[in-house]
Amino acid sequence: RRQRQMCIRDSYWNPVWGEYNRVRNHYNEMTVTLEQPETGRILNIRFRLFDDGLGFRYELPLQRNMNYLTVKDELTEFNLTGNHKAFCIPGDYDTNEFAYTTAPISEIAADMERRIARKSYESKAEGGLTVQTPLMLKSEDGVYLNISQTRRG
């Protein structure tokens, strides 16, 4: 069973510090609610579309008969349209102490392996293909893309 809910928000907020003293918070939002028929478990996927970007998150609302949940895997993927220039560091669970790589997506693994080998880091990117977020990309026509994640709690 699926449900969809939509809303528009247009408000302002005041940051504690930064370049601006007032920031506009304007977006269209759609929440898709998915229900697993066998268990009745519910998952919400909330999308927010801004003038300059898109955000989404998975939400597990408080539910009967579900005291805890173990997330075994997270398989979100992005299907990019080109071999964009990437600005990134290797993905590592215990350090951010890497030099940044600037290379086309197709060459990230090779470039990172060369850099890691020269510096003799203890931790290496898993398979040479994992990158740390945020991942900043630049398309051939000059559009910047930023793939990031946040954690609440």
What role is predicted for each listed range?
Residues V23, Q36, R41-G153:
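Catalytic and substrate-binding clefts that recognize carbohydrates or anionic sugar/phosphate headgroups
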Residues R24-T33:
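Short, hydrophobic/aromatic-rich segments at coil-to-beta transitions
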Residues R9-W17, I42:
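Charged, amphipathic alpha-helical segments
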Residues Q3-I8:
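Short, small-residue-biased leader/transition segments that mark boundaries at the very start
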